[in-house]
Amino acid sequence: MAAGMLTDREREAIVSNLTKDVQALREMVRSRESELVKLHREIHKLKSVLQQTTNNLNVTRNEKAKKKLYSLPEQCGEQESRNQNPHLCSSCGMVLPTSPEFALEALSLGPLSPLASTSSASPSGRTSADEVRPKAMPAAIKKQGVSAESCVQSMQQSYSIPIPKYEKDFSDKQQIKDAIMDNDFLKNIDASQVRELVDSMYSKSIAAGEFVIREGEVGAHLYVSAAGEFAVMQQGKVLDKMGAGKAFGELAILYNCTRTASIRVLSEAARVWVLDRRVFQQIMMCTGLQRIENSVNFLRSVPLLMNLSEELLAKIADVLELEFYAAGTYIIRQGTAGDSFFLISQGNVRVTQKLTPTSPEETELRTLSRGDYFGEQALINEDKRTANIIALSPGVECLTLDRDSFKRLIGDLCELKEKDYGDESRKLAMKQAQESCRDEPKEQLQQEFPDLKLTDLEVVSTLGIGGFGRVELVKAHHQDRVDIFALKCLKKRHIVDTKQEEHIFSERHIMLSSRSPFICRLYRTFRDEKYVYMLLEACMGGEIWTMLRDRGSFEDNAAQFIIGCVLQAFEYLHARGIIYRDLKPENLMLDERGYVKIVDFGFAKQIGTSSKTWTFCGTPEYVAPEIILNKGHDRAVDYWALGILIHELLNGTPPFSAPDPMQTYNLILKGIDMIAFPKHISRWAVQLIKRLCRDVPSERLGYQTGGIQDIKKHKWFLGFDWDGLASQLLIPPFVRPIAHPTDVRYFDRFPCDLNEPPDELSGWDADF
């Protein structure tokens, strides 16, 4: 029957059948997507198990842990089960990593029944052991932080230690420069710094068959191939070959890292150019400090700006852009509207003026040179230029600042002409906080639980593991009472080997002196021959990372609450001149009420209000561009990381992520505008993320004149109860029931550490 002959009832039947078919297909797609998600989770679990098993291959089956801390006594009904199964650890009752059950249990949804605890609910009504038993293993791998050696000593000596220079002819310099500009990461370095790097590279000859770098070894040098042929190898297999003029090993000039490939010489008379990491850091630091000092001195010479605080002058110096004008160029034309201010850094300009609008002749008024400025009235309002400014031969370099950038940093200058342009109340609060921290005697920082000894602590369970050590849940028996703490155990030898002593002391001082409900408390510290210990507040609600892993992502209201808690912590820290530098879900914990606390201050540092620091540290997916490029950084990096965290909470993954750290850094340097946001992330959330993750630090929300209040007032937070959060009267979006003080149901399971670290007796921790 022709389509036009169909009755209304027949058409409705056809439409109904088609609708059913579409619904069936949609259901099939949803089912397949669900299966795909499950498969991805199983893959993540398998990766986690393989990684954990690989890390424990060196553990011998018969080796026993020698603990300084005393284990929790066996519970009823467990001893018999452990004696019957040789694959259970005698100390903690967990499956040994060397046993076949370890891999099977980690892949299952829960513990295998033959290995499960047999204890039942106690008469007191506590939850049974099975109900509080932690999950088997993480289904995804946690992000790891990285750090170079502390730059504190280098900053103090940056001008006193000469930077090494090595003679080269023009072709050698050009070869190195071309290799740098051909590298995705190195090409982002400023031209003036590239010249310094080229001058500081030295030549090294390498025989045929020798390795320039070896896979698995820790590196500290950048190389540029100068002559010969080289093989790129992984696990003994040749992946590629390269000739002269290629840069490689660039990750090693940022921080201590393990080489992921080998470079072997194939030809005779091979030669490379070499740059040491310490020299790279010194160059970047010295040039950065010199640039800031010069710019601030320039700005201070301008009467309109002379009353600005050191902090604001440093901020303005950050947004100054270097522009070159060829000889004869009109930088400013008389009578045109202007919105930019200029400082001459190199060269000369001629100032001319037409005496009348109709006059064909320009009268020369004077010549301006290095250190002079013009166009400053444009910072106040739209200025009609009253003269011409013309670049003289051979050209002129100017530092420029536009009115919009200036207003974002300090507000309307018209309202501040007769007073200090700095934020007086904020500066006073920061000064008082810093003096309080600086003047506080060391004895006062360790007053809580002064009579508690390391031997008073009894290990209940492991809450987490990392490269530096473990975090244990412990009971403290003292003064006729029992308290519960988290004990962070850090291997002293590993700290010394990675040159992290300065970071550990900084973490100790900052945490002992911090008093905020949004920051995990550090009560006191201990030390022995093998470890330094931090006795911390136990946050038994578990990690935000674990919740994110299990849920996939958070809804807006939950993400807003988490970010709100982080902002409260940042407001406290930044007011005291402290930057955090390691924000990520792995470092956020829930207390028993469901409030979020920041933990792990290993990368935190007190730098004051107008200073910068140069140490590369953070988590690759979260580091800001200025950290990657060694430009010097301050609290603006925390606002960048806040934007990354919002994206990860709402989407389940950070916006910049790649299998290799250097690939991740290159993605970060391309910028947030290159990221395609998923449709389920709201428009206001996307806008906030983009305003936090600006390449230029001074353009980030939170770093401008309104401070953190600018973030709190953003439309993504519309209707959020900030007063309720600050007073902790706001009901959290997730409250996780905790049966008793040692209920570890919200933590993953971890095997015993059977490798006892060597003694470390250098004495660096004498004041710990």
Swiss-Prot record:
The annotated region (Regulatory) lies at 1-192
Q: Which cofactor does it need?
A: Mg(2+)
Q: Where does 3',5'-cyclic GMP 1 bind?
A: 249-252, 259-260
Residues involved in 3',5'-cyclic GMP 2 binding: 366, 375-378, 385-386, 421
The UniProt annotation puts the region (Disordered) at: 114-134
- Report the activity regulation comment: Binding of cGMP results in enzyme activation.
Ordered alphabetically, the record's keywords are:
ATP-binding, cGMP, cGMP-binding, Kinase, Nucleotide-binding, Phosphoprotein, Serine/threonine-protein kinase, Transferase
Q: Which CDD domains does this UniProt record tie to the protein? A: CAP_ED (cd00038), STKc_cGK (cd05572)
- For the ligand (ATP), the binding residues are 463-471, 488
Further information: cGMP-dependent protein kinase 1 consists of 3 types of domains: the regulatory domain, two cGMP-binding regions and the catalytic domain.
What family does this belong to? Belongs to the protein kinase superfamily. AGC Ser/Thr protein kinase family. cGMP subfamily.
* The protein's name in its UniProt record: cGMP-dependent protein kinase, isozyme 1
Organism of origin = Drosophila melanogaster (Fruit fly)
